[in-house]
């Protein structure tokens, strides 16, 4: 093997290794993710170095000359190779337009006053520029290599989800979202949603796939769906269902087979009707309240102590009134025998434990006295200590508890105007703040670095009841772009995402289209591009699917 051939193999191997590192560590570590980015960067530069000039310099001339000029000559070759790469890049119009969003962020410095945050934001957004650059100017992968990368992506997520599930069942988590410590649970949900469609491709679409691979793909699909439920990933489940529905619509119109059309229509009907009936039944259960004859309420407990009945307070938990049949002295005494947390203290979520106890007992239909407390198991006591206030939330394989939480947050907001503690109502408050900012800065936006500042000012102006430690940004990427760069910036953002895919016929490719639907819908409820993991996930797979492979996989 010649030196030149060995060099080429080394550079290509480093490039492949960098891609593999990014795929593996996207859900794990932003630091090692950065190593993957730097590995690709190094390989991209070395690939374009003039090897003859490089070796010629070190094989000719005096030793003194080599030592004196080694560093500047090497740097010169690197800069020349970078220039070669950019010249190729500038001839690739779709890749340039995709990466142009980074230029928009640079231009946003004109209107910013917080340059410290702006520069930090530019570092975070670097993948917007470098990933389209690298993939569009490097040798594309063949179909088999592409499939191997996709298998690595899916199997890696299997490991991540199994590890998270093990942690969930073996450690105490106040917030279930904390099981995903290294990447946002929302970004992880998007990755899993995409992996579901990758596994689905090997199950249904890919030809010459062995029965064993199809069986493994089916098991993985079932497992990912279970994980999305037990991890309460509404975003992951939501974008999966929406993407599946859109694909079914596309297949209905594109297919020439009457049986496939019928199957798609039936599947869509099942999704809509089944999902609607399931949601309707949960909402009806939530608002179904026990019938109580207030004139016949018992006055004392079995131990002879007087009950407190607050019949004016209509609060319920799982259909049972909270403030009837309450005997505080018996609860205080009984709780002190069952728990180390003082009755007047707070649970692990920071809520008054006595009220968590009241809600939990009510959710089981028990009276709030010594008798009701005695019926609780040790597992019930542990749940109350963790801040779980409804027995419905103990069932990890059901979405009922999560939907109850959303409905409770909605009712609390209607009665108090305070969205704190409800993810749904907080998002509505974020969007309300966003609309206020957009109304004032719709033309050119506030710039790259002033987002946090203008949101803080807007929340004060609104006199919001949202807790100040949760005065967050819009949780809607379209709003974020509009606030940062104005209406023309939003238009360019959409062009930068749609035009390259249109020109490269990405919308005719199964992998790109499913990914595109997933991320575009996710942008409605999340600032996906505001974190390193999110922007890396978005632009890595966009660039990889569109520029990084030779053959597309048709729908």
Outline where the language-model segments fall:
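Hydrophobic core segments of transmembrane alpha-helices in multi-pass, intramembrane catalytic enzymes
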Residues: 33-44, 120-133, 186-202, 235-247, ...
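Alpha-helical transmembrane segments of multi-pass inner-membrane proteins
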Residues: 6, 102, 106-110, 130-132, ...
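N-terminal hydrophobic segments of proteins, predominantly signal-anchor/transmembrane helices
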Residues: 18-27, 39-124, 153-164, 519
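Membrane-interface helix-loop-helix junctions at transmembrane boundaries of multi-pass membrane enzymes
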Residues: 2-12, 48-96, 202-218, 251-262, ...
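Loop-to-helix entry and N-terminal half of a specific, functionally important transmembrane alpha helix
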Residues: 14-22, 96-102, 216, 220-221, ...
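Membrane-interface catalytic loops of GT-C/OST-like multi-pass glycosylation enzymes that act
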Residues: 30, 116-121, 143, 174-186, ...
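Long extracytoplasmic/lumenal interhelical loops at the membrane interface
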Residues: 342-370, 402, 411-440, 444-485
